């Protein structure tokens, strides 16, 4: 009798350290601040609105800094629903619920984020969070479809290469070796400068194939 086949790769698709929510903010805060700084103020009415918005953001940021748990983070969202601190609070809620094993609540927080802030620089990361929760819950087909959605909707985001890598790794876990190899190859060629490309090259090496050469810049 042949020994039972062992998975090529075990464990979570991505280590949490690869997607720390603090890293999301650190990686994108310059873009967020640049967008805010690019707003041109014209007229008293706009200036008054901007002052109100600034005060709202400042108050929301203060409340966020004092938040100690999920209920207090939700209070930031409820009281200041259209502010950047509210977006930050929703991402923290999603992460906290995930860490507590509440995948449905975590996914609900991610989807709430996407509904409220569809153009936010972290929207791709929120959708990738949905995919990771689906994978953790065993809903593999939905996880793969959501990963594809990240790449399609947010191709320029930091989340896109991680989503493509995640899909390939799910295929690898399911012993779909050739499909996984094609997925890793795609990450290397389409996102050559990303950490996911280096991870994909490592997987290709383990599978006995060479990573494709990165395209010339």
Task: Tell what function each PLM region has.
Residues 1-38:
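N-terminal positive-inside, membrane-proximal cytosolic segments immediately preceding the first
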Residues 31, 79-86, 114-123, 151-160, ...:
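Short solvent-exposed coil/turn linkers within tandem alpha-helical repeat scaffolds
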Residues 74-125:
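Extracytoplasmic/periplasmic/luminal assembly and interaction segments
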């Amino acid at each position: 009798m042949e020994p039972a086949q062992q998975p090529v790769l075990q464990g979570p698709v991505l280590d949490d350290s690869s997607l720390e929510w603090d890293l999301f903010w650190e990686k994108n805060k310059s873009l967020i601040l640049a967008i805010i700084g690019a707003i041109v103020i014209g007229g008293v009415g706009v200036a008054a609105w901007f002052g109100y918005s600034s005060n709202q953001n400042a108050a929301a940021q203060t409340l966020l800094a004092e938040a100690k748990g999920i209920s207090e983070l939700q209070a930031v969202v409820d009281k200041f629903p259209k502010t950047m601190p509210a977006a930050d609070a929703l991402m923290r809620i999603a992460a906290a619920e995930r860490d507590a094993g509440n995948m449905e609540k975590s996914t609900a927080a991610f989807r709430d984020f996407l509904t409220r802030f569809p153009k936010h620089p972290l929207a791709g990361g929120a959708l990738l969070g949905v995919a990771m929760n689906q994978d953790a819950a065993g809903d593999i087909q939905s996880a793969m479809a959501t990963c594809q959605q990240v790449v399609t909707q947010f191709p320029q985001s930091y989340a896109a290469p991680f989503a493509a890598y995640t899909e390939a790794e799910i295929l690898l876990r399911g012993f779909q070796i050739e499909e996984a190899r094609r997925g890793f190859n795609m990450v290397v060629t389409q996102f050559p400068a990303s950490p996911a490309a280096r991870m994909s090259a490592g997987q290709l090496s383990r599978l006995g194939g060479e990573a494709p050469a990165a395209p010339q810049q």
